[in-house]
């Protein structure tokens, strides 16, 4: 259950952070209404809160591992919402990042 919870929280955090940043981008760079940026700021707040729900107690570990999720999630978001087509290097890089996430979060550690 801990692995499933960790993954679910990373997906929630990614949706909130990437979605929030995308909303701000739309307002600033694409000329959308100002309230898009406001919604983006709210979503970014949800991202910050979601990280606190992770079962691991170490801020540095959570945010370092989340960085890999952010890389892969950003590419996926771009594909879905902006028609971005990642090349093989984007995909290879994101797979490497996700492998790093798995090592950081799920490697066996001593309790002490």
Swiss-Prot record:
Q: Give the location in the cell.
A: Cell membrane
The membrane topology noted for this protein in its Swiss-Prot or TrEMBL record is: Multi-pass membrane protein
A single GO CC term, please? plasma membrane
Q: Keyword set for this entry?
A: Cell membrane, Membrane, Plasmid, Transmembrane, Transmembrane helix
Q: Which SUPFAM superfamilies does the UniProt record give?
A: Multidrug resistance efflux transporter EmrE (SSF103481)
Q: Give me the segments passing through the membrane.
A: 7-27, 33-53, 62-82, 88-108
- Family named by the database record: Belongs to the UPF0060 family.
Official protein name in the record: UPF0060 membrane protein Arth_4238
What lineage is this protein's organism placed in? Bacteria, Bacillati, Actinomycetota, Actinomycetes, Micrococcales
């Amino acid at each position: 259950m801990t692995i499933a919870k960790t993954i679910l929280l990373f997906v929630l955090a990614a949706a909130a952070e990437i979605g929030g940043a995308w909303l701000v981008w739309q307002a600033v760079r694409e000329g959308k209404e100002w309230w898009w940026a406001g919604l983006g700021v709210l979503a970014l707040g949800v991202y910050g809160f979601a990280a606190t729900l992770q079962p691991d107690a170490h801020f540095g570990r959570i945010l370092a591992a989340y960085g890999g999720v952010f890389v892969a999630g950003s590419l996926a978001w771009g594909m879905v919402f902006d028609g971005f087509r990642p090349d093989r290097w984007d995909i290879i890089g994101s797979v490497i990042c996700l492998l790093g996430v798995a090592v950081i979060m799920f490697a066996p550690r001593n309790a002490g």
